[in-house]
């Protein structure tokens, strides 16, 4: 199951901040969900008629805003940051490191365009990473299947 997380300073989630700056973290997350849904990668199936396929299955995407407390840059309480994490299984053929790098660039560009010159924003970072099932990742569906089998 892929995950999309938008990490936002908690004070930027308040109505007064939204009213004074126009920044709406919920709208940004909704926009990023659409961007992720549109991400494509080369079809790994040889000879397939479709040259590209979706990078993730949107119906499986879990997404959330994660509020950050005491979130500063370089010890400066006047400087804040946004961070986006997209995690998707590495067991999907074709979802290579270069695909993840391209996805990170696309997501970063979209956040940059969305926030514009937001006061106090010092940094936007994006991390597109693997979910490696061989390294301790499990899902509810997998655990239920295992329990019912034995």
What residue ranges belong to the model's regions?
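A domain-level signal for the structural core that forms small-molecule/cofactor-binding pockets
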Residues: 1-150
């Amino acid at each position: 199951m892929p995950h999309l997380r938008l990490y936002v300073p908690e004070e930027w989630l308040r109505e007064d901040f939204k009213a004074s700056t126009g920044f709406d973290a919920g709208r940004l997350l909704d926009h990023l969900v659409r961007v992720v849904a549109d991400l494509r990668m080369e079809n790994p199936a040889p000879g397939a008629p479709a040259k590209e396929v979706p990078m993730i299955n949107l119906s499986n995407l879990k997404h959330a805003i994660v509020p950050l407390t005491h979130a500063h840059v370089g010890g400066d309480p006047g400087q804040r940051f946004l961070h986006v994490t997209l995690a998707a299984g590495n067991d999907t053929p074709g979802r290579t490191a270069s695909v993840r790098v391209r996805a990170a660039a696309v997501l970063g560009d979209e956040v940059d365009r969305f926030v514009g010159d937001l006061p106090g924003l010092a940094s936007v970072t994006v991390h597109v990473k693997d979910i490696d099932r061989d390294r301790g990742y499990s899902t509810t569906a997998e655990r239920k299947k295992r329990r019912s089998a034995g």
